[in-house]
């Protein structure tokens, strides 16, 4: 079939329109890749040297100061729990302002040259009241926490959806600095309900968090706490055991100790907890020299006073 000049012009225009529509509808470029034993971020292999930092426990006016200090001590990443009961104190009423403005905390971290690892729970532990669960859940009769109880999951979904509205625009794939998101928290030390874990995993994805997901557990709890589609990471595991445990689930890693404990917390009225610096310094040096990514829990000290 012979085409005249006008037909060719129309086809060229149609091709341009189709190409534009395809590019505008395509998903954001994947900026974080996990594989070959490493985290690849924006095309570069990165060893995560991270520190845990809790925005509600630092006065708002000191956020930037603490983030600057984190960068100055050689960290390239901060890890942050999100505390559900800090944002939804009444059912369906969310607060992300002032001290609760976690989006500002994350943007400030980006301005200071830091990646962020987000740990939204819904359960977080963190030596925080009710593990981060809102107290109004206690009024719900016959509600089973940390389970696939449909009512419980509906509350989790409402919280995670709202969190997605606030924070999913800040993933690195969307131009921000959130590089990974954690599914639940040390669930393997509590139960082994894979359907529950999968439900939380899917909620996080559906909320718009388009970066790699991970779980964290002690070495003996990974089997119970791991869920398909998430990188298994470790808490309080050192030396060659890091490789042995992770390789059972993701051969070749990458290897990430999501909670490395250089010290421990004090409890009011009890003897001060102290750790000689030599042993954790030796453990940290070993991990860094063997390419293991690590997050120090904690990187900033706090006093948490109970009501």
Language model region names:
Residues 2-12:
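Bacterial N-terminal signal peptides that target proteins for export
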Residues 25-77:
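N-terminal carbohydrate-binding accessory modules
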Residues 43, 78, 109, 181, ...:
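Conserved, mostly hydrophobic/aromatic
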Residues 66-69, 98-105, 159, 163, ...:
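A general structural detector for well-ordered alpha-helical segments in enzyme core domains, enriched
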Residues 118, 122-155, 163-298:
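Substrate-binding/catalytic cleft of secreted carbohydrate-active enzymes
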Residues 303-307:
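Conserved small/polar residues in nucleotide/adenosyl-binding loops
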